[in-house]
Amino acid sequence: MISVEKGRLPFKSDIKVCKVKRDFPNAKNYADLNAACYSWIQRVIASSKAKSIVIDDSQYLLVNELFDRAKEKSYDKFTDMAVNFRNLIHFINDLPEEDKIVYFLHHSEATSDGREKAKTIGRMLDEKLTLEGCFDIVIYCTDHKFYTQANNQSTAKTPEGLFESVEIPNDLKAVDDAIREYYGLGGANVEEKT
């Protein structure tokens, strides 16, 4: 578990939580700091023996960079934020290990027409990149349930036959097991303390 914003889980667990590092001595400005945060996350993911990794509150990568760079007048900061986040997704999608699954836990927001979408910052991510389109599987959570398919309100999507129901229990372990079985990836029995 890589936690962007908090150091603890909101429930009892033996899961090892790695808080995203925010102190990099070579970072001369906030742009360098945020690039270093993304590089750190990529190193943790690449070096981890764990087959299932969760990035909790991934939207805070965008939020923290926005606040860090709030006094910058240029729109370049929005380009940097979008490119940093998109590059992290591409890094994960290009991992050489087929059986390593990285989950993004991300908040959603309502659009003007009432549908739900991933919460983002800046026009580049909002208008040019459909964030959900970068992922094969998007599961929408509400009322302690996951929704596996869009219902004209969310952007949830899963391959046909992955789940028997549109509504499933909010159990990330069961989701991970189902994905591994569906794609023939084997179990995620590797435990690692980072």
Question: Which residues does each PLM region occupy?
Answer:
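Short, well-ordered beta-strand core segments
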Residues: 1, 102, 138-140
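Conserved P-loop
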Residues: 1-54, 60
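Hydrophobic, Leu/Ile/Phe/Ala-enriched alpha-helical segments that form helix-helix packing faces
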Residues: 41-45, 92-96, 135
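Conserved, well-folded catalytic cores of nucleic-acid-processing
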Residues: 43, 61-64, 134, 138-141
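Short glycine/proline-enriched coil/turn segments at helix->beta-strand junctions
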Residues: 49, 97-99, 142-144
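P-loop NTPase motor core
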Residues: 52-130
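Conserved GTP-binding G-domain of TRAFAC-class P-loop NTPases and closely related GTPase folds
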Residues: 109-194
